[in-house]
Amino acid sequence: VKPYDTDSTTKEKVFNEKVTESTEAEEKKNIKYTNGAVRGFTSPRWTLEYCIALSCLSKDFHKAVHYGMKILNAREYISLTDAKIGEANKDAETEAQLWESLSDAERAYRIYDLMLNGDGKSSLKAIVAQCLASALRWRTSKIPEGVTQEKMFDLDLYGFKTDEAKKAELNTQIEKDQYLRYIVNAIKYAAGEEI
């Protein structure tokens, strides 16, 4: 369920969280996709990306969207430099300050909306997913002194070790998050683990 209404006169999108409608739609989809041993796990809100923007990963996702925009707009160099990362982080921080008075849901909508073009489509989804994965890996790795964040896409190449305490903390946050729980449960179910 899209968290907005469209003004019939101006065609402008007006935020409307629609919690009840989202909950009902999720329940219907889960029933629809559950059959025998196959079980449906669908997002509790509009899309996967919107749920991530609502979740404990919101700040990381917001930055990843800006990293993705920098990569998409870099015609010649499809990588992030420290300067571009700094600009993207600053852009995300500026927006976060501007959006402080908004509800979490409206902030998430604004973050997700950054990914969309005028037609409501996005060519950023795959890029943002890679950026988010790299940012989370960076966040949970033991980074040697002098290594800058532009290396976040090459952590395996450099053989950086994982900081197990940071990884465990992030795992706990993700597993407890109400907007990510459906993904965690789907993975556990597919792996034969108890959910």
Task: Indicate residue ranges for each PLM-predicted region.
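Acidic, Mg2+-coordinating catalytic modules of nucleic-acid enzymes
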Residues: V1-I195
